[in-house]
Structure formats: C-alpha cells, structure tokens
C-alpha cells in the first residue's frame, strides 16, 4: 500500500483523491480551505498544514490546482515542496495552467532532487468522482510507466504526450476546441428551432452521425433539458493560456479569440 499526497481538494481534486483512497492507497492531503477536505478526511485521509508536510509524509505528491500562482506557491513558496527534507521526490501535477509555469517550476525543483510529471485531466467533476477522466501525462516516460496504478485509479483513458509541459498544451488545446464547439452548438440549435426543428431531434441526428461524441451529447443534453447547472467556469482561463501562447508564436486564432470573449462576457454577467 502506497502513501500518496494530494494537494488541492476542490471539485476536481476531491474526486480524484477519493479514487486514490478507493484503490487502497493511504492519503495525506492539504488545501488552503480545510473545509473542502472534510469529506476526504471522513474517508481516512490525513490533513497536513502545508505542501512541505504532505511531501514529508508520502511517497508521491499529486495535485490539482486552479492557477499558475498556486502551482508556484506549492512548489517554491513558503512551506512548499522545495522545503521538504524527506519523503517524496516525485510530483505529479494535474493543474490547469500553462506550459511555461510548470517548466519553470521544474527547473527550480530539480535542483532539490525533485522530478515533475506533468499531467492534465479531461472531464467534469462527475467524471473525476467516477474515475473516468481522460488523463494526459508528459515528462519522463520511465516515470510515467512506473506509476500506471495511480493514473488508472483516476482515469480510464491515459495517454503519454511527450516532453514536460505538453500535457498543459493538450489541456489548453482541448479547452479552445470545446469553447468553439459550445458556441457553435448553441447558435445552431437556436437557428434550427427558429426554422422549425427541435433541439431534441437535432440531438438524435447528431448521435447517429459522424459528429457524435460524448462531449457533444453532454452539451446537447443540457440544451434539450434546459437544466443549466451553475458552476464555476474555467473556460476563459484555460482558453486564455492558449491565446497567450498563440500571440507569442504569432499564430492567428480568430474563432478561438471570439469564443474567449463570449465566455468572458458570460462569466462577468
């Protein structure tokens, strides 16, 4: 039985961490908001007061954090992993951030003997709880191969995508793709309804076409049922990372940029 650490027990992280416990691992956890960790503690997880304390109490550290600054703080800040004097020296980070940040943190932590395996998770909170996430990992292929049991506890589609930071690129790319698809479906359904075809009929058509996918049907289910579940949207952040990199690479992305603006407007209102 391994002892794993998990940092970040929000909507996605709590589900991922719970599945590590279900797989038979001991778990030590931390989060800035202790109340988010109560559910995991009731399942046997042990709460620690800092990333440093987590690292010193486990074999491998995992994390799911919301922002670049959070990842930098966990790795290099006060009470961060870089201060750990024993325990884990492998950090598997699933945070939705940009490539530049994880590569920069790795450059500093490697001086302390740490290895980072960069990950990203595709799916919503329900998939995290069910252990059916798509997981993309990058960094050392040997380290990836050695820790399949961790990944299989949290996801059912696991793909290695190359050099460190590529998993973040994949996450940003998937966010950009999803943003454009969301808007296209919404506009198309409004147009069809005005023309006399119901959203439900269009959903059936999509499910029996080459455009069918789990993601598209999930969006269509919401449109048809009109059951819009309010949840924090990370779309502008994740799409924004992709657009920032596009500007640096001088790659024009007008449709993605428009989708970014529409999601930003929705979030602001």
Segments the model singles out, each with a brief description of its role:
Residues 1-64, 89, 94-95, 125:
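NAD(P)+-binding Rossmann beta1-loop-alpha1 motif at the extreme N-terminus of oxidoreductases
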Residues 4, 96-176:
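Rossmann-fold dinucleotide-binding core
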Residues 11, 15, 53, 60-62, ...:
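Amphipathic alpha-helical hairpins
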Residues 27, 47, 116-117, 158, ...:
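Hydrophobic beta-strand scaffold residues
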Residues 51-116:
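Rossmann-fold NAD(P) dinucleotide-binding segment
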Residues 166-269:
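Helical "substrate-binding/catalytic lid" subdomain
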């Amino acid at each position: 039985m391994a002892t794993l650490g998990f940092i970040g027990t929000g909507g996605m992280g709590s589900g991922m961490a719970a599945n590590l416990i279900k797989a038979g691992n001991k778990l030590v956890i931390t989060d800035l908001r202790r109340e988010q960790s109560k559910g995991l503690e009731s399942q046997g997880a042990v709460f620690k007061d800092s990333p440093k304390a987590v690292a010193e109490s486990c074999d491998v550290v995992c994390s799911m954090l919301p922002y670049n600054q959070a990842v930098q703080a966990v790795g290099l800040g006060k009470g961060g992993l870089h201060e750990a004097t024993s325990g884990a020296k492998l950090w598997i980070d699933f945070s939705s951030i940009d490539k530049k940040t994880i590569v920069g943190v790795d450059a500093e932590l490697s001086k302390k003997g740490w290895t980072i395996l960069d990950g990203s998770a595709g799916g919503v909170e329900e998939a995290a709880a069910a252990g059916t996430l798509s997981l993309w990992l990058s960094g050392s292929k040997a380290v990836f191969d050695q820790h399949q049991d961790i990944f299989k506890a949290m996801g059912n589609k696991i793909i290695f995508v190359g050099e460190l930071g590529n998993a973040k690129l994949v996450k940003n790319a998937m966010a950009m793709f999803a943003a454009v698809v969301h808007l296209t479906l919404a506009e198309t359904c409004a147009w069809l309804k005005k023309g006399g075809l119901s959203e439900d009929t269009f959903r059936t058509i999509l499910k029996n076409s080459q455009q069918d996918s789990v993601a598209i049907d999930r969006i269509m289910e919401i449109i048809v049922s009109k059951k819009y579940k309010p949840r924090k949207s990370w779309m502008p952040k994740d799409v924004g990372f992709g657009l920032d990199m596009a500007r640096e690479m001088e790659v024009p992305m007008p449709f993605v940029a428009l989708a970014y603006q529409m999601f930003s407007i929705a979030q602001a209102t």
